[in-house]
Amino acid sequence: MRIVVLGKELEYDFFDADLLEKYEKENLRVKERIQEPTQYDGKTTADSLRIQCGIVNDFFDEVFGKGMSEELFGGKNNIKDHMEAFAAVADAAMNCNGELTALTEKYSPNRAERRQAEKQNSKNFNRNAAYHGN
């Protein structure tokens, strides 16, 4: 899937189990690290933003490959850019999750059984209609 992040087009396959696992692991890691309160003790707001930007940098380097954060952010610690970039990837993952759910429902055994039953009922209806002169 193509994801546009800060004007740069990235590619990631959320349907590949190994890549999805890496994304999910790093996404959870971002959440845990950002919510760790002790790292902000005694820090200025600017230092806190640098910490958060560093966490997002680590995410991009782990998920998309070493150096991706530098490519995207150019060494800057702009929290707005970092959060928008992270959100773009999260949105893409959620869209793929919706597609995956639709795919699994479409091809689930229960649905296949229902379709077969509907098909059989349709055949029976058509036979009955022909027999009764309808």
Segments from the language model and where they lie:
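Arginine residue identity/basic-tract feature
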Residues: 2, 29, 33, 50, ...
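Short, surface-exposed loop/turn segments at secondary-structure junctions
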Residues: 38-47, 71-79
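Short amphipathic alpha-helical coiled-coil/interface segments
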Residues: 52-57
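Short acidic, glycine/tyrosine-flanked loop/strand segments centered on an H-E-D-like triad
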Residues: 65-66
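C-terminal charged interaction modules
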Residues: 70-134
